[in-house]
Structure formats: structure tokens, C-alpha cells
């Protein structure tokens, strides 16, 4: 018997003194008593608990970790020192520093998830669309793009 869980937070960004806004996954195929143990433990820690199959877990991780990890790595890969960075830039840099302070093995495992490449392809598709709009200086298309993006985050 085994039990598999995946806390969806780490010491870099989570407030370990108050985990009530953090999530954890318990794998559905795990041993029943092991799941009960971790559900009790995570409930005491006030974590939001989701139970997923291994397949569902991989989809969630590719989406909720693969996308921001890849986006942050691409951002950081072209960075240079800025004497007068804007607030958005500074926030992105803080995220990049935090992500890159994580263990290389963890980052690699998230990015090598078999479902991550599809998510990165989706990013590339949207970058291609955005670049085309910018190159054409198409204000109407930009407005449509921004409207669609805003709906995505509602």
C-alpha cells in the first residue's frame, strides 16, 4: 500500500504560518487509510484538499505549475539589470528569483511532466498572435485580445 500527496505550495511563496489559502492534492489511487491520515493532517493545517487520480494530477500540475514556471523562466532568460524598473517588472523579478531558488530537480520534474509541452505550445500560440497584433499595430485586434484575456481571469 502507498499514499501519494502533492502540496501545491512551497516555502518560497506560501505563508507557512497560515496555510488556509493553500492547496494540496491527495491521489485517489492511494491506500484508503493513508488518505484518511493525510486528510486529517491537512484539515488540521486548514489546507484546501483536492482528490485527483494520477492522470488528473498530471493535468493540473502541467497547467497550474508548468505554465507559470515556463513563463517565468522565459521572462528571466532575457533579463538584464534595470536601474529604474517599473512595479510590474519588479514583481515579475521577485517571482523569478523565488522560482529559481527552488530545487533544480523539482523544476525539472514539473517541466518534464508529459502534459507540460502542450501547455508551452499554447503559450507560443498566444505569443504569435500577440506579436502579430503588435507588428500590425492593430488597435481593434488588441482590444479584442485584451477583452478575451480579461475574461480568462474573471
What are these regions (language model features)?
Residues 1-49:
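Rossmann-fold dinucleotide-binding core
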Residues 51-154:
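An accessory alpha-helical subdomain
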Amino acid at each position: 500500500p502507498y499514499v501519494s500527496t502533492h502540496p501545491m505550495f512551497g516555502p518560497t511563496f506560501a505563508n507557512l504560518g497560515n496555510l488556509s489559502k493553500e492547496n494540496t492534492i491527495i491521489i485517489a489511487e492511494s491506500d484508503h487509510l493513508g488518505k484518511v491520515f493525510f486528510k486529517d493532517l491537512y484539515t488540521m493545517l486548514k489546507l484546501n484538499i483536492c482528490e485527483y487520480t494520477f492522470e488528473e494530477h498530471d493535468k493540473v500540475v502541467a497547467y497550474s505549475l508548468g505554465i507559470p514556471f515556463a513563463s517565468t523562466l522565459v521572462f528571466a532568460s532575457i533579463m538584464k539589470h534595470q536601474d529604474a524598473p517599473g512595479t510590474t517588472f519588479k514583481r515579475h523579478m521577485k517571482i523569478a528569483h523565488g522560482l529559481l531558488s527552488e530545487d533544480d530537480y523539482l523544476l525539472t520534474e514539473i517541466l518534464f511532466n508529459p502534459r507540460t509541452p502542450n501547455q508551452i505550445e499554447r503559450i507560443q500560440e498566444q505569443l504569435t498572435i500577440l506579436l502579430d497584433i503588435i507588428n500590425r499595430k492593430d488597435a481593434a485586434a488588441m482590444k479584442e485580445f485584451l477583452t478575451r484575456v480579461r475574461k480568462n481571469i474573471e
